[in-house]
Amino acid sequence: MSKGFLVSLEGPEGAGKTSVLEALLPILKEKGVEVLTTREPGGVLIGEKIREVILDPSHTQMDAKTELLLYIASRRQHLVEKVLPALEAGKLVIMDRFIDSSVAYQGFGRGLDIEAIDWLNQFATDGLKPDLTLYFDIEVEEGLARIAANSDREVNRLDLEGLDLHKKVRQGYLSLLDKEGNRIVKIDASLPLEQVVETTKAVLFDGMGLAK
């Protein structure tokens, strides 16, 4: 690659993004692709500290706008410190959540103004958008059941939210898919992991122009 390529992974809780990414990494490295994987919120020291505040299950009193602004602050620091340098170095950067999460969770889920969120995203990223977004779609009930069955996964504040919020979040993602279908590709995350990995690999390789 002559320049970097930015991929974001999105989806409701329990969609299995992390498991797919773990399976893809050795395949990409075998292809000789320089890959940086990172996550939001987090990715850098300041971002991880903000992540702790956002996801702490005891912070049930957090206001929706406070939550949004914390995500935006983490996003900016993460980009400047880690993502942009990697893209400038020509690497493939795969982010576990990015700008679409704010629209889905704080916009559709919390009911905050979408235009305000778009402006804040623009402000924090200087207009940077992913070259490709992989949206892992799963029914809300199935995703939450996966989380409940996974004893290794630490429960966070968002996991404790009611079913209604998670359904609104999924609708937010589907709305984004309709609006930006040229950038966002939907992947059926309810299928067995091996199939999800193969589909993701095919979509990613096609987007990057890599031979399968």
UniProtKB/Swiss-Prot annotation:
GO terms for molecular function: ATP binding; dTMP kinase activity. It comes from the Bacteria. It catalyses: dTMP + ATP = dTDP + ADP. Pfam families: Thymidylate_kin. Keywords: ATP-binding, Kinase, Nucleotide biosynthesis, Nucleotide-binding, Transferase. PROSITE patterns: THYMIDYLATE_KINASE. ATP binds at residues 11-18. GO terms for cellular component: cytosol. Its EC number is 2.7.4.9. GO terms for biological process: dTDP biosynthetic process; dTTP biosynthetic process; dUDP biosynthetic process. Belongs to the thymidylate kinase family. Phosphorylation of dTMP to form dTDP in both de novo and salvage pathways of dTTP synthesis. This is Thymidylate kinase. It comes from Streptococcus pneumoniae (strain ATCC 700669 / Spain 23F-1). The lineage of its organism: Bacteria, Bacillati, Bacillota, Bacilli, Lactobacillales. The gene is tmk.
